[in-house]
Amino acid sequence: MTVPNHQQDISDSDLESRPSKTRLKQEMHALQVLGERLVELEPARITELDLPEKLTDALLEARRITSHGARRRQMQFIGKLMRAIDPVPVQEKLDAWQHSSLKHTAWLHQLERWRDRLISDEAAVTEFVQSYPQTDVRQLRTLLRNVEKEKLANKPPKSFRALFQLLRQIIPEISA
């Protein structure tokens, strides 16, 4: 009496061609993490991604769910639906949006640094006007004087905000 050996039924080429169980689990987990990133997006962004309707509905539903267990199950379901699509274009679109957001934030920080330098250092005004010759120097100096007056009088920072808005108009946003 011989005992069937299941290992003999599977050829070596079959074993090499299919991914390991661990590899499959890693890929499924990566899809679920991508799904979590998608759930965090605004609904308008989700619809921009041109995903299958069932996946879009599942993502929007996951945003609504607050129960931990139900949300976990929904995320697993989203991971399952993600297996049917090519995740590369979705990942690229998310990365592009994030990169765009980072550039916008860097631009805003640049504006804040200029505003702080202009307020604290009189020589910075000359440097700013040289860097951005389209600047209305009279308006800039007026706003800087008003910022100082408001600060001394403990008034709300109306001119402080107006100075920032002026800088937004003058300094171009960093483009892609």
Curated annotation (Swiss-Prot):
User: Of which family is this protein a member?
Assistant: Belongs to the DarP family.
Q: Which UniProt keywords apply?
A: Cytoplasm, Ribosome biogenesis, RNA-binding, rRNA-binding
The cellular component terms of Gene Ontology attached to this UniProt record, alphabetical and capped at eight, are:
cytosol
Tell me the protein's name.
Answer: Dual-action ribosomal maturation protein DarP
Molecular-function GO terms, alphabetical = ribosome binding; rRNA binding
Quick one: where's region Disordered?
Answer: 1-22
The record's InterPro entries line, in alphabetical order, gives: DarP, DarP_sf
CDD domains with a match to the protein in the record:
YjgA-like
Give a short account of what the protein does: Member of a network of 50S ribosomal subunit biogenesis factors which assembles along the 30S-50S interface, preventing incorrect 23S rRNA structures from forming. Promotes peptidyl transferase center (PTC) maturation.
For this protein's source organism, the top of the classification is:
Bacteria, Pseudomonadati, Pseudomonadota, Betaproteobacteria, Nitrosomonadales
The gene it comes from is darP
Which cell locations does it reside in?
Answer: Cytoplasm
Matching entries from Gene3D superfamilies are given as: PSPTO4464-like domains
Q: What is its main location?
A: cytoplasm
Q: Where is the composition biased (Polar residues)?
A: 1-10
GO biological processes: assembly of large subunit precursor of preribosome
Q: Which SUPFAM superfamilies match?
A: PSPTO4464-like
